[in-house]
């Protein structure tokens, strides 16, 4: 006669972290506060990493920019990597990674 309605609430807050979005958007003078650091930085870039190797002062419009003058095709060194998954010996997998051929056909 009566149908039961099951209402299930799902808690999406798995880490039990309470966010206060009102505080982060209201800075001094009602302006948005910027972050104090970068998100998940892995490697820093120094001045030695800014230009490519063997760059020469050559441009088609002769305005004096630094251009990488190199080979048309990339030179790939011979490398073969053998790896095996030894954590679960019942379900193991052996694979070979090689860089002998190109990925583009």
Swiss-Prot record:
Protein origin, superkingdom: Eukaryota
Something else known: Completely contained within RPL33A.
The protein's name: Putative uncharacterized protein YPL142C
């Amino acid at each position: 006669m009566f149908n039961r309605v099951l209402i299930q609430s799902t808690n999406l807050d798995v880490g039990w972290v309470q966010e206060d979005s009102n505080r982060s958007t209201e800075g001094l003078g009602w302006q948005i506060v910027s972050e104090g650091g970068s998100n998940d930085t892995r490697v820093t870039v120094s001045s030695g990493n800014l230009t490519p190797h063997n760059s020469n002062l050559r441009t088609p419009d002769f305005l004096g920019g630094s251009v990488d003058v190199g080979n048309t095709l990339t030179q790939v060194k011979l490398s073969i990597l053998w790896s095996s998954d030894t954590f679960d010996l019942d379900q193991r997998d052996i694979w070979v990674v090689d860089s002998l051929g190109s990925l583009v056909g």
